[in-house]
């Protein structure tokens, strides 16, 4: 029984990543550049809804030109995180430092701290343990 040669699947994302396993791409001998180019020609012949089809060549250009292929181009196409909402931003780390500083300054030597709750659990009352 003869098997047909595998053609590239039509269900690929516009970043050139195959929907199946990456092993399938290696088996057929396709490179990321060829996948992106075949996808590029496929999408140019079938226009998409709205104005996305006018921007599609500029979106695919990093995929075709970049040596690492779609993985790095996908990261490059992601929108930059807003510095005010980014959890690793400078503003958030400053706020954590201020909070830590306040916690240390508020707790004096004579002020009982939060370890009161764990001590009551350590006393061993069977009603609180599960």
Curated annotation (Swiss-Prot):
It is found in: Nucleus. Residues 77-98 have a biased composition (Basic and acidic residues). GO terms for biological process: mRNA processing; regulation of RNA splicing; RNA splicing. Residues 1-29, 74-130 are annotated as: Disordered. GO terms for molecular function: pre-mRNA binding. Residues 1-10 have a biased composition (Basic residues). Disulfide bonds: none annotated. Interacts with SRSF3; increases SRSF3 binding to specific exons. Interacts with the splicing factor SRSF3 and increases its binding to specific exons within pre-mRNA, thereby regulating exon-inclusion during alternative splicing. Does not directly bind pre-mRNA and could regulate a wider range of splicing factors through a similar mechanism. This is Splicing regulatory small protein. It comes from Homo sapiens.
């Amino acid at each position: 029984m003869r098997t047909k040669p595998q053609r590239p699947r039509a269900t690929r994302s516009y970043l050139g990543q195959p929907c199946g396993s990456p092993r399938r791409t290696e088996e057929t001998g396709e490179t990321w550049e060829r996948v992106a180019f075949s996808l590029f020609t496929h999408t140019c012949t079938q226009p998409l809804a709205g104005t996305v089809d006018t921007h599609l060549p500029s979106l695919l250009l990093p995929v075709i030109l970049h040596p690492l292929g779609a993985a790095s181009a996908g990261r490059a196409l992601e929108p930059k995180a807003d510095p005010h909402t980014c959890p690793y931003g400078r503003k958030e780390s400053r706020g954590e430092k201020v909070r830590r500083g306040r916690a240390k300054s508020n707790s004096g030597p004579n002020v009982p701290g939060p370890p009161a709750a764990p001590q009551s659990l350590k006393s061993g009352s069977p009603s609180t343990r599960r």
